[in-house]
Amino acid sequence: LNDFDRWPADIDGEGSGFLMAMARTITFGRNGMVLVEASPGFEIDDPRWEDNKSSLHQGPPATGIVSLYNQGDRRRWYWQCPSCQESFEPHRSLLRWGNSEDIKTAAESAHLACPHCGHIIVEEGDRFGEGKFELNKKGRWLRDGQKWLPDGSIVGEGVVSDSASFWLFGIAAAFSDWKSLVTKYLNAEKDFAATADTTSMQGVLTTGFGEVFCSKSALSSRLPEDLKARAKDGGERVV
């Protein structure tokens, strides 16, 4: 079921497209399968939802694809830092860029910072470490409750479910690049600061970064403060 969150919630009074598809797999027994994919299309109302979540990988209380994800074993994509070997999710919160007021210049400096040691990861890779392509080749899906240790072993009791569910954020997506993501994000921030219209930001966060949108969260974080908190001077790198 392609782009599931753009489907009607109820089809001719027979329920969701997912439930209808599941019903049609019954005759295939254990071989029956339904594949659903989408970027999150339904907004959430509570900007503090993470305060009440029961597990690390649990998604927000949203309908559509996120609800199906939460019903499964909640797998997330992880990278291993080239410097400290600790694992982490490549997420927008780790994305950094220069403090230039020119959006193009700022976006060209986009990079990721390891949440454990601060190691700078450049998308194309450089002499200081591997880039997105290499990290994706070595990446792993972890079920909710599992942990990837520096020695390569995976520990922890992962969630067990009849459904395998996966959430990949846009930072690791093969056909998206960080410069474009940052450009779109900063332009959306600029539009929001000028108009208080969240339409552009919602599109960037959902289809670009693969996140669920919360307008109340956006309204609580104005442009100047957000950019000052996120922008960092790249400076000179050291080995």
Regions found by a protein language model. Give the residues of each.
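Short, flexible loop motifs at catalytic/binding sites
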Residues: 1-239
